[in-house]
């Protein structure tokens, strides 16, 4: 493994995509303290990270998935039929109402559609969206959600258990394929069912998981277009929704390339070049780097 300089280490600490699902409360708190020790006072991560309540007003996804904020957020309840919110101490179960409604509906339909017992829901967004101190570069406008690839237990977990319970790693140690000891046909059915949702723009998974899906997708492979390989994501998958209708300040992402994404595009992820750390911002985001409306939103009571 190549040596990383101090700046690169700091970037990885801020944007450690692969660490967010499995970190327990103590580990996440340590990364939070490290981030706060280096961030300038006007860093957007610091400003949005201290907000504990949503901004009143109509729901509005403002800006881009990786550079924006969220007005009128609602929280996914900690418990519901066929779902449980994980890592509750992070206070990241907030989202645009369109996303929260989708998660609740998926929790209702997936037991029958995918033989999946229920959703363990990871990070969604902060109460007012915006950049996070740890774990994510996106999740800023309430349209991203992490779903653990661990089946929901048959009992209700305590808050302490939800902050400490480890997530299941589905990828082999060398990163080349799924681990047959943990990967199941239900995982494929789960991801296919979610990808077929019209509101879902794309789903991020580990490249090894994409490779397994390419092998087993069946004759109708259209849903694979939405399954996008990305660093980490061996413990959870990341749902991203399209900008909702009537949200003019929401900036859509460039659509993924046509096709199932199972050829040379996927092969790159298993090259030495792809083993380098994921790209991160050259410097912390400042409040002025976000859409102008975000400064007013974060200043509101």
Please place each PLM-identified region on the residue numbering.
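N-terminal low-complexity, Pro/Thr/Ser-rich intrinsically disordered segments
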Residues: 24-67
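Active-site acidic/histidine clusters and adjacent loop/turn architecture
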Residues: 49, 53-121, 183-190, 197-200
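Extended, low-complexity, intrinsically disordered C-terminal regulatory tails
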Residues: 49, 102-134, 204-226
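N-terminal signal peptide c-region/cleavage motif recognized by signal peptidases
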Residues: 16-18
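Bacterial N-terminal signal peptides that target proteins for export
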Residues: 1-7
């Amino acid at each position: 493994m190549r040596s990383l300089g101090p700046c690169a280490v700091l970037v990885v600490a801020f944007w450690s995509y692969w660490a967010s699902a499995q970190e327990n409360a103590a580990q996440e708190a340590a990364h939070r303290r490290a981030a706060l020790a280096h961030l300038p006072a006007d860093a957007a991560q610091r400003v949005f990270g201290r907000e504990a309540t949503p901004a009143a007003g109509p729901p509005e996804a403002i800006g881009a998935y990786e550079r924006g904020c969220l007005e009128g957020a609602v929280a996914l309840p900690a418990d519901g039929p066929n779902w449980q919110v994980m890592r509750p101490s992070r206070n990241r179960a907030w989202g645009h109402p369109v996303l929260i409604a989708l998660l609740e509906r998926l929790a209702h339909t997936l037991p029958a559609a995918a033989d999946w017992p229920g959703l363990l829901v990871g990070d969604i967004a902060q109460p007012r969206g915006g950049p996070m101190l740890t774990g994510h570069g996106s999740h800023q406008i309430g349209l991203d959600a992490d779903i653990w690839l661990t089946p929901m237990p048959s009992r209700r977990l305590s808050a302490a258990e939800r902050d400490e319970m480890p997530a299941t790693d589905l990828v082999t140690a060398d990163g080349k394929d799924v681990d047959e000891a943990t990967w199941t046909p239900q995982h494929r059915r789960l991801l296919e069912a979610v990808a077929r949702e019209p509101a879902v723009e794309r789903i991020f998974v580990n490249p090894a998981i994409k490779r397994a899906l390419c092998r087993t997708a069946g004759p109708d492979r259209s849903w694979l277009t939405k399954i996008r390989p990305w660093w980490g994501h061996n413990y959870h998958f990341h749902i991203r929704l399209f900008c909702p209708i009537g949200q003019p300040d929401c900036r859509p992402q460039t659509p993924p390339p046509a096709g199932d994404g199972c050829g040379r595009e996927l092969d790159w992820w298993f090259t030495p070049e792809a083993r380098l750390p994921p790209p991160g911002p050259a410097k912390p985001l400042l409040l002025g780097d976000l859409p102008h409306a975000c400064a007013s939103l974060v200043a509101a009571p």
